[in-house]
Amino acid sequence: MAKLIVENQAYTNEDCIHNLINYITTDKETSRVLMVESFGVNPLNKETMISSMIRAKERVNRTNGKQVYHLIISIYRTKNSMSNEQKITYGKNIIYDIGNYFLDHNIQSVLALQSEKECNWDNVHIHCVINSIDMQTGLKITNTASLFKNLLSMLIKEYPFLRMEPYVTYD
């Protein structure tokens, strides 16, 4: 089954945006980044994505408290019959739907599709970093439980073959 996970961390330190975007967009020993997309930020490179999020906060004096949210969408977290190429193709489509979902809610996002080797199969997943403020109002995002539940509902409707777990996991 596919799964939507919200990382339940504070993300309040001043360099968390920089660290998290670098983390999701950098190859590691066991995982590789297949694609990076951004919505509502300058897409030129990692640094412009990071500075776009930070500047949006500075413009409205919202640089304290929770800075970002980190979501992971696992595309069949366990070994299954779907080929790695199919998972990657679905992941690329899902990235655009998620990015546009948050953009429709005036939320900046950076997403990365990754493939991580686990035993003899690939765990294809998407990391999503979203800003904690509304781009139009400058207010902190509230009612994130509803925001994430509606995202999950959209994914379940648009991608029924993924058999998404029907609940958001907070990890």
Question: Could you say what each language-model-derived stretch is?
Answer:
Residues M1-D171:
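N-terminal nicking endonuclease/strand-transfer module with a His-rich metal-binding environment
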